[in-house]
Amino acid sequence: MTKGFTQNSSTEATAGNYDASRIAILKDYNETVREVNPEAVVILEHFCDEKEESELAEEGMQLWRNLNNAYCQSAMGYPSNSDFTPLVTFGTTMPYGGWVGFMESHDEERTAFKQIAYGEGPLKSDINVRMKQLAANASFFFTAPGPKMVWQFGEMGYDVSIEEGGRTGRKPLHWEYLDNEARKGLCNTYAKLLKLRREHSELFNPGSTFSWLVKTANWTGGRFLTLAATNGKRLVVVGNFTAKPIEAITSFPVTGVWTNYLDGTKLHVTSIPTGLTIPAHECRVYINF
């Protein structure tokens, strides 16, 4: 809660305003930590003015980036307020890697719980559909460049409310989730996407070209993400968050053979753009390597 590292008084409404003295204090803390351990990772729960967060990031600190509401909305099947674009630093004053994005945290409600409580159609009642939608969420989370945080058991579709036993109450462990095929499938999707980031990190560095169409207006026709590394590696994500199959008009960067990284199936792209039939609540992660 580094927003409180200041001697200036404020209200709830003004606490996040730019504060040069707070920046100076946190820079001093950061420098002291790095004198002891130059490799230390300093992450702040700050949630302040972007100019202030940018200056802190320029000093090598990282700051939480809360996208819980957007990913909860998409998880429940609602296009309103489901814009993912604030997850990334592109088009902002933040240096690359300054934000650590998250879909869930200790302070926010579980996406899977909100599916059960408020989801649209089968997202409320069918665990197989819920896990597919959460896999689509993950595919548009981990393939976006920049650091990410995963809150515990989110990879299994943990659906116990944050209010269970009180907000800070002990929450039940559910390792048996992995005995459920749908939940295990979601966990495998997380693992594969993290492996992709680790083994092909050049796709996710500042030198790569990144674009995505993930705003509210990009709901009914499909959502898209494209990454192009300088070594020729390409990645294209196509997702359908709706309750019906769609014909997603997809602009692959090049023709040729593409592989769905999540299941290994091949796609021969002979023309650009290409129409792809994407079933309801599903996602494809295509690579050309």
What are these regions (language model features)?
Residues 1-108, 139-143, 154-233, 242-256, ...:
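Active-site-proximal helices and loops of the catalytic beta/alpha 8
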